[in-house]
Amino acid sequence: MADPLADFGSNVDLTVQEILLAASQHDVPKLRRLIRSNDKDGNPANVKDPETGFSPLHAAIAACEPDEAQTETNGVNGETSSASTEQKSLVQSAAETVKYLLQEGAIWNDLDLNDETPGCIARRLGLTELYEMIVDAGVRAELLLNRLDGYEPLSDDEDDQETGQGEDAANEPAAEEDQDGAPELVETTAADASAAEASTEGPGPDVTSSRYLDSNLTFTNDRLLDQDQNGVMMAWETEIMSRSAKKLLPTTGLRVMNIGHGMGIVDGFIQEQSPAAHHIVEAHPDVVAEMKRKGWHEKPGVVIHEGRWQDILPALVAQGETFDAIYYDTFAESYADFREFFSEQVIGLLEQDGKWGFFNGMGADRQISYDVYQKVVEMDLFEAGFDVEWEEIKVPKLEGEWTGVRRPYWVVDNYRLPLCKFMD
């Protein structure tokens, strides 16, 4: 077993060192004693080594990495079987340690100095059981935070003083994610924010819906950027948009609505399916102007709605408009906005046998975040009365795509294309 703590410096606080060592040795009883007896500020389950950035979760999982000597001798003179048994036992003890740390409030997506979360390490080492444990912890944390987002904090000062809890309690860093406002539902996580702060360019201004709508956009052949160089839409998404349009519109003559025109990629493919009616909701005035310049308002069946979907859709519902297909691809909106869209608006706009989809970029700048948000959205869709099917599409290598873009919003290998419909 490799020693994940071998590089610990002598300047590490003794208590921190003991906690991290106990985590790496999967010594749960000792961990429990150390954590319960800790009298320092902060959660001891989230202490960090200053030289590696390891938290106890990182240390517990990294301890399962085989050392070089063990790797070299595997398969020689029948040693594979014993090594495999030893590794299974090691992973099992790690699982117990991870379970305990999560129960104590360990942050599932904390970043080390190698820009890895505990789940990233588990995935890199092929430790599926541990990876799934971290994913499930992320799902629980995100579901909780999303629910808390819907509650107003107590405004009674006396209540706050009596309980010792005010808004700070709701702001504990128990979990991720980003918000970069979700460009095309690309969520920015707390982990990503830390990474941005460590970069040479810095994190830059927050991406909010109001800032985006007030910004000047730059249109080129292969990308659409806002004034902060955030990628609003890029040409590499073309295959995804083509497949989405064909899945939503398997036949001609259907009624469709797209929310978020951007570069017009998906709307172009929708036109190829010869819809009977093609409604487009677009909030940014620069995009609307570009649409008119390109003659979108003159295309067959096209109706352009200028404004935010939050203002447009209720009016369409009141008018009795319905659609066979709906696509959602907005920029700089939060997951809460998206949840409101499918929970409150789709039900009044989609035909009973209709289909709808969305650009699935939530957490796509880190595989574990992408996996977490797939489960989160599945649960929320189920609660709203929708079934969802996923189709995996291989994403091409994008190394050269991000030149001139503030940050890559896509790093995972496969895109999961969603197709949603009402439950039977």
From Swiss-Prot:
Polar residues bias spans: 71-89
Cysteine pairs bridged by disulfides in the record: none
Keyword tRNA-binding included in the entry's annotation: no
Superkingdom to which the source organism belongs: Eukaryota
Chief location of this protein within or outside the cell: cytoplasm
Compositionally skewed regions (Low complexity) per UniProt: 163-173, 187-201
Residues annotated as binding S-adenosyl-L-methionine: 212, 241, 261-266, 282-284, 309-310, 329
RMT2 domain segment(s): 205-424
Localization terms from the record: Cytoplasm; Nucleus
Disordered, as annotated region: 67-89, 151-212
Family label: Belongs to the class I-like SAM-binding methyltransferase superfamily. RMT2 methyltransferase family.
Subunit structure: Monomer.
Function: S-adenosyl-L-methionine-dependent protein-arginine N-methyltransferase that methylates the delta-nitrogen atom of arginine residues to form N5-methylarginine (type IV) in target proteins. Monomethylates ribosomal protein L12.
Record protein name field: Protein arginine N-methyltransferase 2
Gene label: rmt2
